[in-house]
Amino acid sequence: MVAGRIDGVCVRGIVGCVPEGRETVDDLARRFGEDAARKVAAATGIEERRIVAPGQCTSDLAEAAARRLLDGLGWDPASLDLLVLVTQTHDQVLPGTASLLHRRLGLRKGAAVLDITHGCSGFIYGLWTAAGLLRAAGRRALLLVGDTTSRLVDPDDRAVAPLFGDGAAAVALEQDEFAAPIAFDLGSDGAGAPYLAAESGAMRHPGRPARLFMDGTQVFAFTLREVPGSVRAALDAAGWTMESVDHLVLHQANAQMIRHLGQKLGAPAGRTVVALREVGNTSSASIPLALAGALAPSLNTASRRLLLSGFGVGWSWGSAALVVGPLALCETVVLPGRKCPAETAAPASPTS
């Protein structure tokens, strides 16, 4: 377990991005039958998911979110010292997707970039990494998270096809000596690696088709075993009580699990956020998409105490307690399905 606090770093804005394409319960009913599709929707709280168009990749969603955020804040891309990208669905083997986005967004030549391969815990790991690096050196950072998990899903697999959607988000971070500390708790257990995996591609299984496998029973047991303790550790590191938290935002895996964890943690009524009905489980992007969607009216107008927790593949988990708002920009944008992949378009010119 890694627990601690990072001082002097503030969240300035959050923009989520989802693709235009949708798959609804009605679409699933045509594939799996009406009763099966409705039962899954009732159990998970997912009625539709956003799906990327052919040719669209994680970087396209992340770029759209980043451009809107930088424009809304009035930040010159050349003012960024750091870009951290979290995804488990990279555009290609190498170079890393963060390097591709460095070029496309027009960051200055000396800016540092970093790829982190993490799934549902990835937003917390990315926030911890970006805030820590920014505190050590630099003034401004851009944290990008996103996944196109639909590309890994067998459309005929009833265990995973109704759950996963695609999405990304961009978060602007800036040094601020008056910012409240961000408290973290993180952990991993590699014994869980076989239970949520896509054993394909890369070097070990280069010819195997990319297919996501999930043992739902093991995932649920892991979540109940590790997440409550992590959330409480972050609370303790912040010096908060659960009653003092304005919003509890857990990884948006399914509605039943979220509500169960909220009750187990003793969250006051109405403070546990459930925001996956129209997007599904968007992996690393699920927490910031909830912030940029369901909580946008709250975060745009006032300062809020947020308690966040992500958990999943690895096993890995992470929780954070932080004060956010009022934000200069907090919203969600849609990437049109007709938009060409950005790598085929004219690149932005990096500044020196």
Label every model-predicted segment.
Residues 1-54, 157-221, 225, 229, ...:
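Condensing-enzyme catalytic core mediating Claisen C-C bond formation in acyl metabolism
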Residues 12-15, 86, 117, 141-147, ...:
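Short beta-strand segments
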Residues 33-42, 92-107, 143-149, 198-203, ...:
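Acidic-glycine-rich active-site phosphate/pyrophosphate-binding loop
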Residues 65-81, 229-246, 294-299:
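Phosphate/pyrophosphate-binding loops at sites that engage ATP/ADP/AMP, CoA/4′-phosphopantetheine
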